Amino acid sequence: MAAGTLRGLAVAGGGESSDSEDDGWDIGYLDRSSQKLKRSLPVEEKNETFKKALTTGDISLVKELLDSGINVDSSFRYGWTPLMYAASVANAELVRFLLDRGANASFDKDKLTILISACSARGSEEQVLKCVELLLSRNADPNTACRRLMTPIMYAARDGHTQVVALLVAHGAEVNAQDENGYTALTWAARQGHKNVILKLLELGANKMLQTKDGRTPSEIAKRNKHLEIFNFLSLTLNPLEGKLQQLTKEETICKLLATDSDKEKDHIFSPYTAFGDLEIFLHGLGLEHMTDSLKEKDITLRHLLTMKKDELTKNGIASKDQQKILAALKELEVEEINFGKLPEVTKLEISGDEFLNFLLKLNKQCGHLITAVQNIITELPVNSHKIVLEWASPRNFTSVCEELVSNVEDLNEEVCRLKELIQKMQNERENDPTHIPLVEEVSTWKTRILKRSAVTVCGFGLLLFIGKLTLQRK
């Protein structure tokens, strides 16, 4: 394996790399059979072998080297300790072993802590969680920030580790801390589109109104990064989840947030956090968690729920107070409701031309809004199906609705053409009617034309007289 590649792997996820080109991690092939340790080996060779053992995760060789006298907190050329490297690659077994041998869990290099290295490690959430749990058990500070003022919870939220976020808060992490750009853990989760992390942070008391240094809230950050579902969810003013778990003790919080899982390894008590669907997130945001099971039993999707009227909600057994919350939320989510209720009643015989023209103008304006809305959706919709944010229904359902839309648009086109023909027919009949009296505008136009001609004639005569006088004076 190339040394350059492995050097890249040795850099912690927090992005705090060494300025030195030679970081001391020149990893080559390690043959245990040819690397039998002898206590008489020079210190330099022992250190080199130690680095290779850490890289390969060879715990037995690491143990043998430590037994031979190498310091567990040895600082290599770039300043990392063995524990920091093990945490940065989420090697929980190696982290446990080094801690048991007395490694310092609170060590930092240029404000990059071992806990931050673990929270930003490239590994499964299960392995990251194990490492974080071990470090916290050895009194690692969850609020120590790196040079960019990012705390461990921000790294965990950025990488979508819901359980890690919960565990850090349970151990005293400040949920609303801000980095050098004003980002909180919630802002980072919104930026990356981690909806489960967002839901958990709101339960833990995250303030969704805190702004970045350029004045953006988490919802605006989500919209900017095209996470529209998260933008809509965070835009809701109702948020009964906020601070829901803040009053619990540390032990109660851990038990509440992290359930046991008998299928997992015995040395790791935490089970993966259950993923929330769109319906669950919407209901949780309104404090209507109790409705989840009943709606699922009736096969009511979020898309269906969002289109229901009050009578439909009642038919489906939704209580009046719950209906009010849903309808209020839907009102906030509406971008622009097309309301034809205020259009004039054109069926009345007494309707004036102005009212009818006003009706046509409003109808045309509403059609323009519809065209713009569809164009915006086409622009924003991802080309790849796996990037679609609103997973409310299958693409087949979307296609079916689009087919109905096309049919309705064709019907509308036919009706508008009929209306145009009818108006044209009325206009022709009116012009051919001998009893037709010219409109006021027509009469005024005729009079105006005569006045203009008279004015031109008078000016012409005046000009001729003026020229005649000049000619006489010259003579």
From Swiss-Prot:
Keywords: ANK repeat, Cytoplasm, Developmental protein, Differentiation, Meiosis, Phosphoprotein, Repeat, RNA-mediated gene silencing, Spermatogenesis. Residues 1-25 are annotated as: Disordered. Residues 272-334 form the SAM domain. GO terms for biological process: germ cell development; male meiotic nuclear division; regulatory ncRNA-mediated gene silencing; spermatogenesis; transposable element silencing. SUPFAM superfamilies: Ankyrin repeat, Pseudo ankyrin repeat-like, SAM/Pointed domain. The modification Phosphoserine is found at residues 17-18, 20. It comes from the Eukaryota. Plays a central role during spermatogenesis by repressing transposable elements and preventing their mobilization, which is essential for the germline integrity. Acts via the piRNA metabolic process, which mediates the repression of transposable elements during meiosis by forming complexes composed of piRNAs and Piwi proteins and governs the methylation and subsequent repression of transposons. Its association with pi-bodies suggests a participation in the primary piRNAs metabolic process. This is Ankyrin repeat, SAM and basic leucine zipper domain-containing protein 1.
